[in-house]
């Protein structure tokens, strides 16, 4: 049951990362310079006080998103993108943190189709709730680790109805981006590096993915030219309980097949 092993492995890795990021947020909350800049409502000072934090946690912990939010859930500062601020944040993790006054975490879909593990924590200074701090990491490295540990390959497919096509096309400079959007009827492939290393022909890759997307199957044997693959899928369910897409896995089992045929 490859899908069950993959699913439980990914969930465990996500939880492990989330726990470590909660510790990071707690350290940031208590930084005196960050607290002072927030209380002064100085965006420039807050950026200057927190950018070294971002550089360190980006390098050491793969954090790609770092936010400070107002109590009304509007964004005050994106440390990773300081030119953009002032927008309403409607994500489930922030709403949940605001409702419960507890740290919230889970995987959510980003604007450009990337899955992001987000951790949002209420921020208290001298016992008073002043805002929310959010950290996020794109989850691609977890799939890399899953593939290596369980000796299979896994790719991420996102439902097209969860994406804005024009925004998605802006995310990549690849010349065949229109082909990539249209290659599958209901999904787009987020990352293809692993499958590229296994199947060099682009048409063959998508044919294998289509077989792996068969909703009736937990896994099946597929043939691509002279290679045999075991393929299957399981749904990507975000923290709000919405199905955002599917993970498709494939294992090249040609050696085993040929050995058994001898």
Residue locations for each model-derived region?
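Soluble periplasmic/extracytoplasmic beta-strand elements of cell-envelope proteins
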Residues: 67, 153-155, 248
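Intrinsic low-complexity, intrinsically disordered coil/linker regions enriched in small/polar
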Residues: 141-226
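Extracytoplasmic/periplasmic ligand-binding sensor regions of membrane-associated signaling proteins
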Residues: 55-136, 144-146, 213-226
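Juxtamembrane extracytoplasmic/periplasmic/luminal helical "stalk" adjacent to the first N-terminal
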Residues: 1-44, 48, 52-64, 103, ...
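Conserved beta-strands of PAS-like sensory domains
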Residues: 114-148, 230-259
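Amphipathic coiled-coil signal-relay and dimerization helices
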Residues: 36-37, 70, 74-81, 118, ...
